[in-house]
C-alpha cells in the first residue's frame, strides 16, 4: 500500500496541523502551488490569520477535516521543567490516527522540533505501522522567507524505505524542496536540535569574548574583525543575549539527552552571565 500522491494536484489532499509561524508559511506555500489544502489549529487567532492570507479551508474543529493523503505536523514543541515537552506531537498523532484507513497509507511528516527516537515510537505505539512516516525538520526563518523559507535545502529521514520514498515524492517532486537524505530518521531528528545548539554555542563564545576584551580594555568589535581575517575563523557579533524561542529551547533538547553536555551547559551559563553583565553596564 502506498500513499496517494498523483501527478495531478487534484488527486492529493494535504492537511497542515499547527498554523503558527512555520505551519502558516507552509500552508501558504502549498496553497500558492494550487494544491488542495486544509489547515487546522486549536487557536481561533491562528485560524483567522490563515484566512487573512488566503487559506480558506481552515478550521478549529478536527472533525471538519476530511481524510487526507498527507498530514504535515507543525505544532509547537517546548520545554516543561527544562525537559522536552513533546505532548503536542503525540496528541496530533492520535488525531491523525482517527483519520487513517486500512486501505491506504497516508504520508505523515513531522516538521516540529523533536528528539531522536520519537518518530519510531509514534509509528509503533500510535500508528501501528499504518502510515508512511517521515521527519523533515523545518529551517524556516521569518526574517528571510524567500531565501530561508519553506523551499530551501532540508533534511529528510523515514521510519522505513517506503516512508522515505513517499516523503521524497511529496517534498521533492510535488513541493520542489531540495532534500538531503539522512542515513536514518534518528539522524534527521538530531539534525535540527544540533544545528541550533551549535549556533547557540557560537554566539555564547562571542559573548564571552566580548566580556574578556572589555575586561582587558580592548574593543571587542575590533578584535573580532581582526580575527575574522583568517580564512577559517568567523566570530559572530555579541548583541543583547540569545533571544527567541528556538535556540534556547533546542540546546536544552540536546543537553537533556545525555550527560556529555559540559560545553553546551557552559554556553547556557555564559549567556546568563552575559545578560547580567550587560545589565550592570547600564
What is the role of each PLM region?
Residues 3-66:
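NAD(P)+-binding Rossmann beta1-loop-alpha1 motif at the extreme N-terminus of oxidoreductases
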Residues 3-13, 34, 214-282:
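NAD(P)-dependent Rossmann-like dehydrogenase/reductase catalytic/cofactor-binding core
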Residues 6, 99, 121-136, 140-141, ...:
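Internal alpha-helical scaffold of NAD(P)-dependent oxidoreductase catalytic cores
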Residues 40, 59-61, 134-136, 182-185, ...:
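Conserved beta-strand termini and adjacent loop/short-helix elements that scaffold enzyme active sites
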Residues 66-67, 151:
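Alpha-helix C-terminal capping/helix-to-coil transition sites in glycosyltransferase folds
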Residues 70, 79-142:
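Rossmann-like NAD(P)(H) cofactor-binding subdomain of soluble oxidoreductases
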Residues 75-76:
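Conserved NAD(P)H cofactor-binding loop of Rossmann-fold oxidoreductase domains
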